[in-house]
């Protein structure tokens, strides 16, 4: 094994990372620093401290990263109206660069020469964690136990835990049949019956949202205030970024908004089925496009739409800390200088319906757009020359006998 003196482990306190902790201590004979991130996953993170202490860990980091997560990662991503493969709002992907950043910061603070994570060798997360780590600390060692050990089943992990007296919960609570990941932006569900792409997901799988059929029969109206492309208030009440997203999750969930069942293309080459709940993000995406519709120049809006799939792919595949993502982010952020105003939405049985938008920076001119008499604001005769000039190349081709049918 490589010479490792101290390693920072991304630690949840669950079975997998608890086994990894002991495995690192025994296999590398090194000191382990644990790092547990609170990203709004809705679980108690403090029990991870007690478990780490019981296993002899002396340096334990438990960080509340909810505000940083939404402010510096989720909000910048939504300024681009980011969607991967037409549907996925990147709830898992966008959390990984922050975890990688904090792993490296802690490594620098503690003098650690390595980091470790619990991502498997089949998934995208190993790539996301490690690309971020290498970008931020080129010489760091990365230990990925799932690519090294032979503990490739839950049974083997349990046996290892029992053999080494690793504290694990043994109560009667039924284990979820799905592999789940959660943060303030979403919950994901994979594995189990979802590995059959024809099998419908079960209703009791969903944790944040009611079914649209069981959502309230009365719609709810909601006003979102934007400043430079970010939401700063709901119904006139100013909120921090994390509070905005948490509130939208609650409201959206009550109305059955944000459920998704997709098959996506993983970076490592395979297709994977995932179900996602992203109520707040679904609302944010619809509202942001609405406020941009009146504040962005047409060509800027179209260019953003052309660049968005590339930007989404960079996030999905782990290139958040790459120079190309940073370049695109500067362009996206520059486009948001005038994205200010208020969007009014109607939430009803899984639907997010835009019912109004207004802004002091609006480019919508009712005097020009009206179907009524415009008082000379727009000379319709000008359209003839505009059309002829734009048709010129096609007329030339037709005159040359180039058939189009």
Curated annotation (Swiss-Prot):
Record bears the keyword Endoplasmic reticulum: no
Record-listed E.C. numbers: 6.3.4.5
Reactions that this protein is recorded to catalyse: L-citrulline + L-aspartate + ATP = 2-(N(omega)-L-arginino)succinate + AMP + diphosphate + H(+)
Gene3D superfamilies in UniProt: Argininosuccinate synthetase, chain A, domain 2 (3.90.1260.10), HUPs (3.40.50.620), Single helix bin (1.20.5.470)
Binding-site positions, L-citrulline: 88, 93, 124, 128, 179, 188, 264, 276
Molecular function terms from GO: argininosuccinate synthase activity; ATP binding
Record-linked PANTHER family: ARGININOSUCCINATE SYNTHASE
Protein name: Argininosuccinate synthase
